[in-house]
Regions:
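Short, conserved acidic/polar surface loops in the N-terminal third of protein domains
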Residues: 7-12, 32-34, 192
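Carbohydrate-associated surface elements
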Residues: 24
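Short beta-strand-loop/turn "lid" adjacent to the catalytic site in phosphate-handling enzymes
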Residues: 1-21, 50-54, 85-106, 129-132
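Glycine-rich beta-strand-to-loop/alpha-helix junction loops that act as flexible
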Residues: 1-4, 133-134, 182-185, 325-333
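Structured loop/turn residues at beta-strand edges in well-structured enzyme cores
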Residues: 14, 125, 321
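A conserved helix-loop-beta module that forms one wall/lid of the active-site cleft
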Residues: 120-135, 363
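Active-site core segments that coordinate phosphate-bearing ligands/cofactors
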Residues: 28, 35-48, 52-53, 58-91, ...
Length: 405
């Protein structure tokens, strides 16, 4: 699943309440609140995580501050993928990659950080044993087998964070590469053997996540196609029905470089009238105001492409490496306009696909664990040969570079 969200269970293994999604205002101010208990530098040096109000740690801190009775009743916290594994098997464990999204995980020791947990006054007992991606958790319960009239089978903890399963499917042959997992969120980064946690990565607020085979991902979380998805929902509420293809065509026809937004501005996090918020942002920053759907979508796409360049430059500065290709995976690869704009803005070739990267990665981990595929290199080769990839070469870089400056 997506990262950071969780459920609390009581001593009988029952949900205390339904999980609450991270797009909720209860965590406002919790990042600053945490710095009263543990310094920002120490916090980052342990977890190596990008500070974002949505992170699990700040959700738990909000519960402690505002609804402490829930934490007092809780016996176990399970992140969303682990909750499904528990419902299937009855076993309570936490998979490594999803644990690393919580900002409660020691990135170097690859376990829960008692220092962070204790500093923030959170109950240590609710955190379960951490297991690696690819661990066989157990069998599907007899109750489910009887209900569905199926034979027993193994449940394998894949990379529970969807980005990390998607990363398994990146169709590369290189050790050093840049990926862009593009969906509701855009996650741009590189795969490394050990976390990068230093003054520079802290300044850039870059995150380290655990991945398959104990690899680490060094990446930036960027608000992604949420901006278009939520704009589309707003237009539907206004009686304007557009599919994504139509919106892309309207964007192609719109005036280029009319205005830019920072996709990560807090104004765009919550659900609602994103087009109005974009106009408000442009007004406040003394830019031209986008006046129709095409101009809004063009503004979003151009702004995302520029943000990808900005983040790529930060990644390169921290790794001291250059990259020849951006491997773009996920639903966003269906947008030819965004793929081309990404190549243009970053002045780098884009390889687009597979679309269903998370699914491919999920299946590949299970096949590797059951010895049907030899290793990660072979898995990526199979996925590459099973998909029609699209490639985009940079165009008009001088124009994009001028606008970027």
């Amino acid at each position: 699943t997506w990262g950071v969200d969780f459920a609390l269970l009581d001593k009988d293994g029952q949900l205390i309440e339904n999980p609450v999604h991270y797009r909720d205002e209860r965590t406002l101010g919790m990042v600053e609140k945490s710095f009263e208990k543990i310094s920002k530098n120490e916090f980052y040096s342990i977890t190596g995580n990008q500070f974002m109000e949505i992170n699990t740690v700040f959700q738990l801190l909000a519960l402690k501050e505002k609804r402490s009775h829930l934490l007092e009743r809780a016996d176990v916290m399970l992140l969303m993928p682990d909750l499904f594994n528990y419902l299937l098997t009855g076993k309570m464990v936490t998979e490594n990659s999803i644990a690393s999204t919580t900002q409660l995980f020691d990135a170097k020791e690859r376990t829960w950080s008692d220092k962070v947990i204790n500093a923030l006054g959170l109950p240590r007992k609710i955190f379960t044993k951490i297991v690696s991606s690819g661990t066989i958790i157990g069998d599907i319960s007899e109750k489910i087998c009887d209900e569905l009239k199926i034979e027993k089978c193994k449940v394998i903890a894949v990379a529970g964070h969807d980005t990390q399963s998607a990363l398994v499917s990146v169709p590369t042959t290189e050790k050093d590469f840049v990926f862009l997992s593009c969906g509701t969120w855009s996650l741009l980064g590189t795969e490394i053997d050990e976390p990068i946690i230093n003054e520079k990565s802290s300044k850039y607020n870059i995150t380290n996540e655990g991945g398959y085979e104990n690899k680490a991902s060094f990446l930036k979380n960027i608000i992604g196609l949420w901006l278009i998805q939520e704009s589309k929902r707003q237009w539907e509420r206004e009686g304007k029905e557009y599919n994504f293809s139509t919106l892309e065509e309207l964007a192609r026809e719109a005036k280029p470089f009319k205005c830019f937004i920072d996709p990560d501005d807090p104004i765009f996090v919550q659900a609602g009238d994103i087009p109005s918020r974009i106009r408000e942002y442009c007004l406040k920053t003394n830019q031209e105001i986008p006046e129709n759907c095409g101009e809004i979508v063009r503004c979003i796409n151009e702004s995302l492409a520029m943000k990808y360049r900005y983040s790529l430059e930060e990644i390169k500065d921290c790794t001291n490496k250059n990259y020849d290709v951006i491997y773009m995976v996920g639903g966003g690869t269906q947008s030819k306009l965004l793929c081309q704009m990404t190549a243009n803005a970053c002045n780098i070739k884009v390889s687009a696909g597979p679309i269903e990267a998370t699914v491919y990665g999920n299946i590949a981990i299970q096949l590797m664990k059951t010895n049907k595929i030899e290793n990660l290199y072979k898995a990526r080769e199979i996925i590459r040969n099973s998909n029609d990839m699209s490639y985009y070469e940079p165009q008009n870089y001088e124009l994009w570079d001028k606008e970027y400056e």
